[in-house]
Amino acid sequence: MPSQYDLVRREYLKQLSDYTGRNTILYYSAWLQKSLMANGTFDFGINDNDKTGFMTCIYQLDKTKGLDLILHTPGGDISATESLVVYLQSIFGKDIRVIIPQMAMSAGTMISCSAKEIIMGKHSNLGPIDPQYGMYRAHGIIEEFENIKHEHEVNPLGTQVWGPILSKYTPTLVGECQKVIDWSNGLVKQWLMNNMFNGIPDAETKADSVVENIGSHALTKSHSRHLHIDYLRNLGLNITALEDDAELQDKVLSIHHSTMITISSTKAAKIIENQNGVSFINTIG
């Protein structure tokens, strides 16, 4: 028996789908509300388990209507993200829009760059795509090794203080970090060229510029950096302002607020749901 929270949220989802004439799936994570409650026991990020949720929600949809993906996520696993994008594009082709009511960080930004169009508000943000390798930021590890190398060339005796730090790292770590950076950047470049920038004469140059700006830890300074609409538009991304259509804005934000109330007031920790009320909900607590 669906709760009142479910009924309200699903009604707003249906209203948005009816308004756009498109399939609509929301993907919401409760990482902002429940990460401390989970205490490391729940994966709030994009992972391979999400594929089952999307399969459940896509089944029996009219695939000719395209897809609007409403995304709210801290990011997640690169391999799961790649597989999800490949799956969605195999079903809906290039007719995918990503709507960002609030935040789509890291791997969520990668998914956004695979779409033909991003819809976001003045309050919305994407984030840097610089990846992690295990527990560590890949760019940070490479920068640290480069600093050690430089200091050793200038003052070989001075680098002894780095011994305890170096002892934590495996011999192949730097190479593995570079590979995961190349993987992340390569995916975003490929997706941009194949969809959002498809048919544009300077597509590769534009894609390289986007990747350089959102993929460089040296430029973004922090993996948690919030990248807003004006900055992202200046990079050349195809972004429509949510405020350009007052009715669309009202419907999207109604979905957002009702979903945030759901994950704040119930045990739901991740919700994947379509406009027909078909859902895949993970809970904790």
Regions found by a protein language model. Give the residues of each.
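Terminal-region recognition feature
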Residues: 1-103, 109-285
